[in-house]
Amino acid sequence: MTRSTTPEGLRETILTISRDLLNEGGPSSLSMREVARRAGCTHQAPYHYFRGREAILVALVEEGYRALERALREAREMSEGRAPQDTTRAAGHAYLACALANPGVFRIMFRS
């Protein structure tokens, strides 16, 4: 991955890399140094945007819940006026699509 030229771009790069790490190897694979290495920045740069690993996880979970809410809302709107089982089916498909798109984040969102 190449170094971003804007602060907003680097923050998004950090989140994208972190999401990829979670999807590849779960929470234990996420480290600030590995994120920095993959982002092509100094090992301290991610700390400019996030206090640490937990802050990245919180940001990803918040992003995950927003994506899930958006997907469920769209499913409800698309099935408006249909039978209740169609609405339930559409919601189930939306839920599964979100889970399959980002399994690492989803596991953290719903861990016990």
Q: What are these language model-derived features?
A:
Residues 73-105:
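Hydrophobic alpha-helical connector segments
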Residues 13, 17, 21-55, 59:
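Helix-turn-helix
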Residues 1-9, 20, 80-81:
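N-terminal intrinsically disordered/low-complexity leader segments
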Residues 31, 106-110:
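Short, hydrophobic secondary-structure boundary micro-motifs
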Residues 22, 56-64, 72, 109:
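Alpha-helical DNA-contacting segments of helix-turn-helix folds
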Residues 17-25, 67-78:
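Solvent-exposed, amphipathic alpha-helical segments
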Residues 14-22, 64, 95, 99:
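Short hydrophobic clusters on alpha-helical segments that form packing/core surfaces
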